[in-house]
Amino acid sequence: MNKTTKAFLATLIIITTAVGFTALKAQAEPIKPSVVVIDTAIDASLPVFKGRLIQEVCAMEWALCPNGTGFQEGPGSASTIPMNVLKSVSFNHGTQMASIAVSSNAYVNLIFIRIVGMTKDGYRASTTEASVVKALDWVIANKEKYNIASVAMSQGNHDLATYNLLCPKSNLIKYIDTLKSINVPVMLPAGNDYDITRVDYPGCIPQAITVGAVDKFNVINAYSNGNPTQVDFYTPGTVKSILPGGTQTTVAGTSASVQSAAVYWATVKMVKPTLSYDEIYQLLKATSTPTSNSKVKNGSLINIEKATK
């Protein structure tokens, strides 16, 4: 660890964030770690993203990015969408997830990758695995440029007829494995279907890190899919978020849990930069708080305070 890093770490102070967790804020300015949020679209005009949203990307199988192609990078790439559409149920998810991410640690930067297209009629186009592949491929290529620490994608499906074919034979595996080899985890939701027998696709992919939700009492929420053989970590599932246009709301689900888990990983990487992927994973496991409910036992609730000591 060089003198600059030591001096920076010495200036870290503990603060309590808007979502009620402890995070780290810096008074010095080395290269900040970035969390990539892959989702629907983002209201980049919101004050919460000022100085935090450092890159927008659009990556889709279809030619539905704002520039009329299947790829776009730069301001407006993920946010050029009519406000009435952005506020709709089909597209407001991304802004909410990004707001949770930036609220979980005041020091982490945000990169937003849009993978959901809008049809000519203003409806949500289908989201494909190929779009996610393009997004992850961009992350691999830009990991060093933006100091990317983790990826959060709060998208999933529990009712695929091809579920058993996709897990664990998804085309995403190669890209998730590559990111793991460069110390970047891909965090995915367990899903919210009250099903303790399995988690959503693509969270079922073994190479990914699957995140479930606990309630305000740190008990595993009944809606949180899977069990600890399938779910790597748990974090609170009911948190405050911001909708497009700036209205504050409360969101509940494993989608929210994914965002804080990804930021917690980035926080550990920031405080302990020499740790590898496997070392951070084991540290989060070793310092976690046991969690359970009446049907699911031995879950691992991330304890970021212990993990960053």
Question: Where are the regions a protein language model picked out?
Answer:
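Bacterial N-terminal signal peptides that target proteins for export
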Residues: 1-9
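Bacterial N-terminal signal peptides
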Residues: 10-19
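Sec-dependent signal peptide cleavage junction
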Residues: 19-30
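Active-site core segment of subtilase-fold serine proteases
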Residues: 28-109, 117-119, 134, 141-147, ...
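Extracellular S/T/G-rich loop segment that most often corresponds to the catalytic His/Ser-adjacent loop
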Residues: 33, 39, 200-270, 274
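Structural recognition of the beta-strand scaffold that forms the well-ordered cores
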Residues: 34-38, 109-114, 147-154, 185-189, ...
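Substrate-binding/access-modulating region of protease and related hydrolase catalytic domains
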Residues: 116-205, 217, 246-259, 293-296
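C-terminal subdomain of the subtilisin-like protease fold in secreted/lumenal serine endopeptidases
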Residues: 146-155, 170, 182, 207, ...
